Amino acid sequence: MPHRVVNLCNGLRLVHKETDSPISHFGVLVNAGTRDESSRQMGLAHFVEHTIFKGTAKRTPYRVINCMESVGGELNASTSKEETYFHTSFPSTEYPRAVELLADIFFHATFPEKELEKEKTVVLEEINYYKDTPSELIFDDFEDLVFAGHPLGKNILGTARSVKHISREGIIDFIHQNYTLDNIVLASVGNISTQRLVRLCERFFGDEEISDSPRPRQPFTNYQPHTLCQRKKITQAHVMLGCPAYNIHEDARVPFLLLNNLLGGQGMSSRLNMSVRERRGLAYSIESNYTSFSDTGLFSIYFSCEEPHREPCMELVYKELDKIRNNALGTIQLHGAKKQLVGQLALANEAKLNEMLALGHSALFFEEIDTFEESIAEIEAVTAMQVLDVANEILRPDQFSILIFK
């Protein structure tokens, strides 16, 4: 059954896909994340995500957590550079409970001072964990290198100093400025009719007043490649290289998504993995990644290896990039790349929580939301020349930033 999009009486958008599953998923997705913090608010978006569950006007922190767990459900949240998600998975008979709970959390969280201080300790431990995990830390530091001086480069967790200075007043101000009407979407995939879900959402979300004041984002411009080598107490070298790429609205995003998957995506058969790990055993881990934001994107290659293998690995990476820039995919290669990506997306879409989050994400950025079939058709329409064009525009080592931990 296709998804449906409905506007509630207060203008809030709801996207829902009806299923016959015994398990359902419902979420509140906000188009606000790390890049929307001021220079003195580092880590605030993530801290809001942590502390919004710490009690409401009518629920203690325990009652918030136990509300869904008592019926076998789960309550979760996540923060990224541009979005914050609050969502729950639950037996489909518990839709009223799920919708009411998320509305209560979202509109009536109290952020008690005592709970804020406790959660600061938790986040500081999280920051220390990442500092001790170079394979995680390098991703954050690489974004800071590429987006130097721009909010997209800021660490999602913040710093120890910035977290310690977060205040309840700052939290309330951030929510008021960023959790605005056109920045919020309700998303659902589950066993309930659209008509009944709309009634529930009108009951618990429809009467709330939500600010609709626009909030401009600082655009990212004037990228300059940088190379940085840092010495750390580690046994392996960790390397990242890459540059800005296409934003979420650009047509070139789809052929580049296909190209990235072929080059170093999920499969063990990716070109980078076959060349560096499988054939030569020079690295334990190698991958490429592509993330699209609202006004830019990021392409990166990551690998970890013994220090003596670092330069040979770099040479092999550049050779693979040369091949893919100078040789158009043949008919069989292109068909295989499409088949692999389509299959991966189909498997991911089988997880209905992922489908709910994907629908909500699309609703945040697009007026019209593609069906799964329409997304697949976009991939199938990609030509070998389009792949070659995006390869030559993005996969150029002269515009790469490079970060090395050794």
PLM regions with names:
Residues 11, 18-68, 142, 251-263, ...:
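Active/ligand-binding-proximal structured segments within catalytic/core domains
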Residues 1-10:
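Short, Gly/Pro- and small/polar-rich lid/capping loops
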Residues 46, 50, 150, 238:
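Histidine-centered active-site/metal-ligand motif
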Residues 18-20, 27-29, 212-270:
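His/Glu-based metal-binding/catalytic segments typifying zinc-dependent metallopeptidases
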Residues 14-16, 28, 186, 241, ...:
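Generic preference for hydrophobic
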Residues 7, 63-213, 229, 246, ...:
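Charge-rich, well-structured scaffold segments of protease-associated domains
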Residues 15, 25-29, 52, 76-78, ...:
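Short, conserved beta-strand segments within well-ordered enzyme catalytic domains
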